[in-house]
Amino acid sequence: MMKAVARSRQWQRWVCSSCLSQRAVPAHQRRRFSNSPKSAAVEFEPIIPASHAPPLYRDEDNTLRSVFDYPRFWREFSSHPGGVSVGLFRNAYLKEPRGFLTFARVSLKKARAVVSKVLAASSVQEYRAIVRDLDRLSDILCRVLDMADFVRVTHPDRNMQRMASMAWDMVYQYMNELNTMTGLHDQLAAAMANSDVTAVWSEEEKTVAEVLKLDFTKSAVNLPKKYRDRFVELSSEISAVGSAFVQEMAPDQDVIVLPSSDLRGMDPLQARELTRGGKVHLPTMSGQAALALRTVHDADARKLIYYASRTASRRSVELLEHLMRLRAELATLSGFESYGHLALRDRMMARSPEAVDKFLRALAENNRPKAMQEMAELLAEKRKAYPAVKRLDPWDKDYYSDLIRRPLRLTGRQGDLLSPYFSLGVVMQGLSRLFTDLYGIRLVPKQPVVGETWHPDVRRLDVMSDTEGHVAVLYCDLFYRPDKSPNPAHFTVRCSREISEAEMAEVWQQSKQDPDVPPFASPEYAANDGMTFSRQPNKTIKQLPTIALVCDFPQPSGHGEQQPALLSFFQVETLFHEMGHAIHSVLARTSFQTVSGTRCATDLAELPSTLMEYFAADASVLGQFARHYETNDPLPYRMVAQKVRQARRFEASDTENQIILAMLDQALHSPRAAQPDFDSTEIFHGLQRTYGSAPPDPPGTRWQGFFGHLSGYGSTYYSYLFDRVLAQRVWEVVFKSGDRGAALRRENGERLKESLLKWGGGRDPWKCLAEVLGDERLAEGGEEAMALVGSWGSTRQN
């Protein structure tokens, strides 16, 4: 019925082109594929406007910069007289680690009460409430799961992590029981079949009902008990094998040993660090090996490195193929033709593997001429040294690409010239100003209270609307710490949801009777576990989206911490990308948590974040905030344009790689996985030969054994390509590619918000796209709509 949808999954990225020669590690260890906007290639110096903030907001705007850029200011701003802890995120249960277990126990009591209510429903009135009741049940469980999921990977206190993991396990086990509970499925089906019930449901309620119904179907709840038991066994085995595949993936050859003379062209300092007894010992799956493929002059040396870095161990491939076969069995058990058919039925715009195939083929056709042109450029570059050669070898691509890119690259001191214009506080100012222009919301620093945050470096920002007041809470843990993951991440710690008066009264009564429940000041706080809420104009109560952003930007430095944290342009893109997820959570404040925020179609979830990367490189947007931290001089935009041009070089070839990987994902989750002669290596090499312009991998290699994304994103890897195309289309159609300040116009932001962002997953995403793009061909979705999107392409014209 409901799943432990880890909202942290949004930070997972696909395999960027620079990583294709390395081991594919878990998706959360990957940065997204580079995606820079068309307008960024235009060289001009924009007029730098003053802040658009009204006088009332200018103090907030200045404070926003100061809390991130000036440590002394932050220490004074965040200081408090002490007192009793209010609990992590102001959750009254989480004042100490063992509070997590109490939180889980109380939540399970609430959940069982809701289950009993749903199972007892018999009247039309009771059936009308079933969707709301099941959504509340999901929210009760996800409050624990999402909070615990965040804490166990981010909190610096190991004991807190341990208790969070225990709480997560308690609730997840109960959720698995619910997923195979036939009574809940039957009651939902009865409600959906009764026209007197559905006649009063809103569009959002009907969408939630369909989502919950699909969740039940995918859990095999409608099957006889022995098949349900096998379903549970298979699910457990798939989880174990998937984890083993990711954790044990390894190359066939761990180290490549070469004479040091063979590595001419490589950074001599790095080569020297790896040299022992006149031989270079190069770890196969390392940054140094990837660097060698780009810079070593000797083609034979590059060939050895290429073979080693593209050949996974036989054990890795065996685990991969075992995982695919188990998924195929699970799909058959559940009544689906393949795992791809099973996976794409739930919260996916594509809806079927056939539609994904239409999209990928159309995209490949659009991209192929540009990819072939890029390969011709590489061959021409190779012929400068070897005039008689007729073809490129697989180990040539990175080397000659790097040769062509070098003149475009900002090198030496030039590479550091962008960072002084991007202090972290200034970038946060820019984001707030952009959101004010587009959506009428702003980021306001809020003094944290005792126990609210997990580290003194964490800043709390309240998201304020010009018309609706307080709409979300954003916690920013953006500075490097030794105990932190280096991966940028967005977590939805709590979703938006409307809370009824009856629910508040019930929880308030429980708080007075259950000794495990801490004291609360009011029914509203009791219903929100002490966390922040808002009262709507119609007097209803909504739990506010609570979001955490985690990055690893440098700490302020210099004498007396006078130099703020300065970001590279890459880090600016990263922050804009993650804030795109956050703004989706903020704007999609639905009445039901099942469809709130980023709980939309999986292949739509990356659209808002990918779109934000276009804003990060737009001249008018940068003109609003990018100034030198010492001189206050405006950013020379030509420097950004040069950076973008370098990143876009060989973009079509990079896209082609992604298309082939998405096709591989589809093929491995097709009915072929259940056949006796299933061979993942043959499938991968066949796709390269059929759809690749670049030279395919040579026989003997097995790169697919490094494709860790196959574990977590089975049959949905195409989503990143899909959202790249959609983001580019929205940028061009809605924001006019940033022309004449279109990226800052309120009417354009309102169009995006009202047509798409505010709905979360509560409306058919194809209807949202058709409305925002003004293209009715998309309204019904299906295979032809997927093919149409693919035909638009994702590689910008020069």
Language-model features: locations:
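N-terminal mitochondrial targeting presequence
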Residues: M1-T63
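His/Asp/Glu-rich acidic catalytic environments and adjacent acidic regulatory segments
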Residues: F44-A111, D149, V153-R351, P456-V458, ...
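C-terminal, non-catalytic "cap/extension" segments appended to globular domains
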Residues: H52-L56, E60-E96, T102, G430-L443, ...
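Membrane-entry segments of alpha-helical transmembrane domains in multi-pass membrane proteins
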Residues: A92-A104, E126-I130, R315-S316, E354-L363, ...
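C-terminal non-catalytic alpha-helical accessory regions
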Residues: L108-T198, E656-P699, G712, D739
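Active-site-proximal, well-structured secondary-structure segments within enzyme catalytic domains
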Residues: E203-E204, V208-E210, K225, V232, ...
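Alpha-helix N-cap/helix-initiation motif
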Residues: S316, P420, L424, E561-V572, ...
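Active-site recognition of the HExxH zinc-binding catalytic motif
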Residues: E321, A328, G335, F435, ...
